[in-house]
Amino acid sequence: MHCEVAEALSDKRPKEAPGAPGQGRGPVSLGAHMAFRIAVSGGGCGDGNPLDLLPRLPVPPPRAHDLLRPRSPRDYGVSKTGSGKVNGSYGHSSEKSLLDLDLAEGPSPSCHQGLFLPAGTPPPRGHPPVCEKLLHFPHPNRSPRPQATFVNGSLPAAQHIKQEALPDYQAMVSAHTPLPTHCRAPSSMGLPSDLDFPDRGLTNPAPSCYLLGNEPISDLGPQPEAHLPEGSLKRCCLLGLPPTSSASSSPCASSDINPVIHSSQTALVSCVNGLRSPPLPGDLGGPPKRSRPGPASSDGQEGSLQLEACRKSGFLKQEPMDEFSELFAPHHQGLPPPYPLPQLPTGPGLGGLGLGLAGRMVAGRQACRWVDCCAAYEQQEELVRHIEKSHIDQRKGEDFTCFWAGCVRRYKPFNARYKLLIHMRVHSGEKPNKCMFEGCSKAFSRLENLKIHLRSHTGEKPYLCQHPGCQKAFSNSSDRAKHQRTHLDTKPYACQIPGCSKRYTDPSSLRKHVKAHSAKEQQVRKKLHTGADPEADVLSECLSLQQLQASTLLPASRGKGSQTLSQELLPGVYPGSVTPQNGLASGILSPSHDVPSRHHPLEVPTGSHHHLSPLPTAESTRDGLGPSLLSPMVSPLKGLGPPPLPPASQSQSPGGQSFSTVPSKPTYPSFQSPPPLPSPQGYQGSFHSIQNCFPYADCYRATEPAASRDGLVGDAHGFNPLRPSTYSSLSTPLSAPGYETLAETPCPPALQPQPAEDLVPSGPEDCGFFPNGAFDHCLSHIPSIYTDT
């Protein structure tokens, strides 16, 4: 470790004198314009040349430098050079004096801090890892009265100045670009690669890293951001930066740094607040001041810590402050506090406090948005007390101006203190005037509003209408003024909606009118939205007409079939409707049709119902429909015709898949007649199959001569479901003559299609399952079939 002596010129920064390597330099007496530099070489314990450190800071002009330093009553006299004792060590200071403590080490993480460069200046490169801090010492107070030292070892000024920026301070601050702090660590330390800044420019800022003399150096290694306690996060300059502390990792460097730390008894700061703008009058860029424990902080948590971002730049208005306001004044004179400082209680306005010149409101906290204050509190009462004591009671003379950020008064002063107090309730949200009536929880910031509200409970209406002949009274003058406009036919509140010329005497009526407009628009949108799907409406109407026609079709039918008609017409819609196999057939048959023996074979045990496929089930639909529905329209001979033929039109393919024996047919136009009844089993197939596959096949005509009553009866009792014949028989009721079974799949091309006149119409546009025209067409073929037998 060696010291270098530099001489500071009158109008420039102290220049670095050529350093002589080696240790054991004797004490050097520094003059008024001198500064010394302490450096630790990183290679070994005492050998090596001093490292080339970062370039020195540019010093502002003399006038600006005079404005930078803190003022006291003694500063207005002739400035003298002297020495002040800080924790046992002497330091020389003057207007231009500066103490630079440069700690450099090789492999350890380092901080390039304390730089205030103009906008556009690139960061310094090509320097070894160093950690440098510029410590600013104030002018010592030589008064015989003892001064109370702060925690960090600095001496306070004799008199504090309260600073308030003019309204244009934001524009002045925005003209400068802050240079964030930077920390760099070698890759061997295991830190993220994005912390290597010299190759990337300015990317990731780092917080202040403090070294405390009575703490071991090994505890101050680089720590991940996620593992820092909440208290440490609150003390990292309150600037939202990743709290990464840097310290020495070399034992030799640690042994050299410790004597320096203990000799000065002050906290050596490794990083400076880098989010500050270039130095302007009244702004030194120091870290925030912590409240000093003592009688002045008797209010406890109310004296919360001040943010550095709240110190405004620009031409400042200065007023003397009392002892209480010392807690809220910016403190530029002292060193920043040690990094871990557990002995000081953390103020409630610290955790999660938002940044910004005006002090942004944080969720769950009450923030003060006075122009030079960013204190925050947990409770609203604390904020109200803070505003009154710190910002209103401290004002002198007749100046009662609200400096709340964003206030609509725009710094227009009040002529009385109580008016400013009442006005501040608008910003703080305080409503001390509460309604005393039971069940009413309303509160008001102004007493006048509470009085008007109480009249709603008491019924008092002291404001009478002044129009002759009108006896109306009102509880407040504003309602009376609205009412009187009706007598004068004055309607200043007009509807702004295009096409509407309505006008009203009061704004409440206009608001109701605008709501009516919005309700009408919503109704129109709803109608347009519902009318955008006409197909759904057509389908619902079709289904409702189908049920209505079916319910009016069987007034003359008897039995339980008429009771369950609606369920059997649409078995797919009513899935729970399952009836016996021939219940409807036996129930809706006319008594004059004496065919007990012919319907006996149709009574299949219900236990075999699970063997039925959807196709024979639909086939049985027509077994009972022919004689029952058409009995009024055909002769007794036709009604007592031969029993139905065995089911046909089901052929087995070699793969075992069943196909219909009749190909798809063209369709006839739809009819408006009611559809016939389906079978008691209900339709188990698809709706599309019924509409498109209801053919009439010629295969029955080929088998008509061989059909006989006896053979059919005997065959019905002993038929084999798997017998090899032209028609695959299944254990289902026999089909009626002249009808074809339904098919789910397309018909094979084995049989020739029937002519158009022999086909049953069933178009996709038909609403019913079986249009009446289909039965009229089938009846024309029934006589030719029965007359041959």
UniProtKB/Swiss-Prot annotation:
Tissue expression: In the adult, expressed highly in placenta and kidney and at lower levels in the testis, brain, colon, brown fat tissue and thymus. During embryo development, expressed in the frontal nasal region, branchial arches, somites, vibrissal and hair follicles, limb buds, craniofacial regions, ventral part of the tail, intervertebral disks, teeth, eyes and kidney.
InterPro entries the UniProt entry points to: GLI-like, Znf-C2H2_ZIC1-5/GLI1-3-like, Znf_C2H2_sf, Znf_C2H2_type
Keywords: Activator, Differentiation, DNA-binding, Metal-binding, Nucleus, Repeat, Repressor, Transcription, Transcription regulation, Zinc, Zinc-finger
Any one GO CC term of the record: nucleus
UniProt GO molecular function: DNA binding; DNA-binding transcription activator activity, RNA polymerase II-specific; DNA-binding transcription repressor activity, RNA polymerase II-specific; RNA polymerase II transcription regulatory region sequence-specific DNA binding; zinc ion binding
Compartments, record wording: Nucleus
Signal peptide location: none
Protein name per its UniProtKB record: Zinc finger protein GLIS1
Organism: Mus musculus (Mouse)
